[in-house]
Amino acid sequence: MADTLMSDIPFWQRKTLDEMTDAEWESLCDGCGQCCLHKLMDEDTDEIYFTNVACRQLNIKTCQCRHYERRFEFEPDCIKLTRENLPDFEWLPMTCAYRLLAEGKPLPTWHPLLTGSKAAMHGERISVRHIAVKESEVRDWQDHILNKPSWAE
């Protein structure tokens, strides 16, 4: 009986991030694409600035990587989020499931694991499909900083 009750509880509520299988870990990603927007770092302060410039491999409409399994071949600078390096990614969005679960918080109501699709996430405008621009179309990256520092205004 206890095993049946445990299986009724979603894995993200009964397991720690470290206990999850690779498939469970991957399924936490809501597919918003925010990780796939380029970030700029101030050379003097190490402050990170977010842009709306999409990685060349990001399909802006679907918010999915065109070559996810081979992304490091196409984009050597692509960063893989793991259980081990999660604490280093302070820039993860406040809505990120990895961040939320690491902080002991629940998944948002629009998360695909709860709704069964990405439609609610896109509807809440969490995904980048409404703001992202193609890297090939960008001339001045500073014009695309979303959290502009005072010196850039």
From Swiss-Prot:
Q: Which Pfam families match?
A: CxxCxxCC
- State the family it belongs to: Belongs to the UPF0260 family.
Name used for this protein in its record: UPF0260 protein YcgN
